[in-house]
């Protein structure tokens, strides 16, 4: 995926997000994606190469490394970023589905018919539920990966010395040393902190979305000026019925022209 495609996706996500969603997207892109791309490979690229153990037993170093690092940190963070950003794409797909449905409706019934959606990107109906479930899915993914990161490495700290005990083919207890542990510890805390900020922003957006829906429901029954949703639905239904009658030949598509010719039969319509 090139930068233009990524920019287009991020622009689409930003367009249909709330204020909290836009801040969340900025944090993800600046403090997680860019930092991951720029610094992760340099910090964690040599983790297995410079993992030294005080033994010459063949295969012992690899076994100790696999015992302490069952999965690489950078690969775990890459999976986390992929799974966290995927729910936002579902919102874009839902909006695209609405726009395509609206286009087919206008093409079939004409431009005079009422619209199916006043605004395809407005979070009402099914799109609201899609957006809500996307936020819940983000929270689940964030908490799940933080739990995995804390469980697999026994906390977020990065020790300088790890010991392999009773791990074949290593003899007895083997001491192993991690390369650049302080730098890796700082980087780990930074990524965990960015993930925690994203969790707080997602919870705020979730509360905002629910409160906004409740307030809109409370004010829904109040009388408002202008055209009501029921009148729009009535116009859409009338338009569809008229369209079907025209196709069946039961209604003249231009009744005004017939009246004109009945009053002046010698006139030629222009």
Swiss-Prot record:
Residues in the signal sequence: none
Coiled-coil region(s): none
Biased composition (Polar residues): 258-270
Residue ranges crossing the lipid bilayer per the database entry: 21-40, 76-98, 127-149, 188-210
GO biological process, one term: placenta development
GO MF annotation list: gap junction channel activity
SMART domains for the chain: CNX, Connexin_CCC
Presence of keyword Transmembrane: yes
Extracellular side: 41-75, 150-187
Main location: membrane
Top-level taxon of the source organism: Eukaryota
Cytoplasmic domain ranges by topology: 1-20, 99-126, 211-270
Entry keyword set: Cell junction, Cell membrane, Deafness, Disease variant, Gap junction, Membrane, Non-syndromic deafness, Palmoplantar keratoderma, Transmembrane, Transmembrane helix
Protein's cellular compartments: Cell membrane; Cell junction, Gap junction
GO CC entries: cell junction; connexin complex; cytoplasm; gap junction; intracellular membrane-bounded organelle
Any Pfam family matching the protein: Connexin
Topology in membrane: Multi-pass membrane protein
Chain intervals for the UniProt region annotation (Disordered): 250-270
Illness association: Erythrokeratodermia variabilis et progressiva 1: A form of erythrokeratodermia variabilis et progressiva, a genodermatosis characterized by the coexistence of two independent skin lesions: transient erythema and hyperkeratosis that is usually localized but occasionally occurs in its generalized form. Clinical presentation varies significantly within a family and from one family to another. Palmoplantar keratoderma is present in around 50% of cases.
Quaternary structure annotation from Swiss-Prot or TrEMBL: A connexon is composed of a hexamer of connexins. Interacts with CNST.
Record PANTHER family: CONNEXIN, GAP JUNCTION BETA-3 PROTEIN
Family assignment from sequence similarity: Belongs to the connexin family. Beta-type (group I) subfamily.
Main function: One gap junction consists of a cluster of closely packed pairs of transmembrane channels, the connexons, through which materials of low MW diffuse from one cell to a neighboring cell.
Name of the protein in question: Gap junction beta-3 protein
Underlying gene: GJB3
């Amino acid at each position: 995926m090139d930068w233009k495609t990524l920019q287009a996706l991020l622009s689409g996500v930003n367009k249909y997000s709330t204020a909290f969603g836009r801040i969340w997207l900025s944090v993800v892109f600046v403090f997680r994606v860019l930092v991951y791309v720029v610094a992760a490979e340099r910090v964690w690229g040599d983790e297995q190469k410079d993992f030294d153990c005080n033994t010459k037993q063949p295969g012992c170093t690899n076994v100790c490394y696999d015992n302490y690092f069952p999965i690489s940190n950078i690969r775990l963070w890459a999976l986390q970023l992929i799974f966290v950003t995927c729910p936002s794409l579902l919102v874009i797909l839902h909006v695209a589905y609405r726009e395509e449905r609206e286009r087919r409706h206008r093409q079939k019934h004409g431009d005079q018919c009422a619209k199916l959606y006043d605004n395809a990107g407005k979070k009402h109906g099914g799109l609201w539920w899609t957006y809500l479930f996307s936020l819940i899915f983000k929270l689940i993914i964030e908490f799940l990966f933080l739990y995995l990161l804390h469980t697999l490495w026994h906390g977020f700290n990065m020790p300088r010395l790890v010991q392999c005990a009773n791990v074949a083919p290593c003899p007895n207890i083997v001491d192993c040393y991690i390369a650049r542990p302080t730098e890796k510890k700082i980087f780990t805390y930074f990524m965990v902190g960015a993930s925690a900020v994203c969790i707080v922003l997602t919870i705020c957006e979730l509360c905002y979305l629910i409160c906004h829906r409740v307030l809109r429901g409370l004010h829904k029954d109040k009388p408002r000026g202008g055209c009501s949703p029921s009148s729009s639905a009535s116009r859409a239904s009338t338009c569809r019925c008229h369209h079907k009658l025209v196709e069946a030949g039961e209604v003249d598509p231009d009744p005004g022209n017939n009246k004109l010719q009945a009053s002046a039969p010698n006139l030629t319509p222009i």
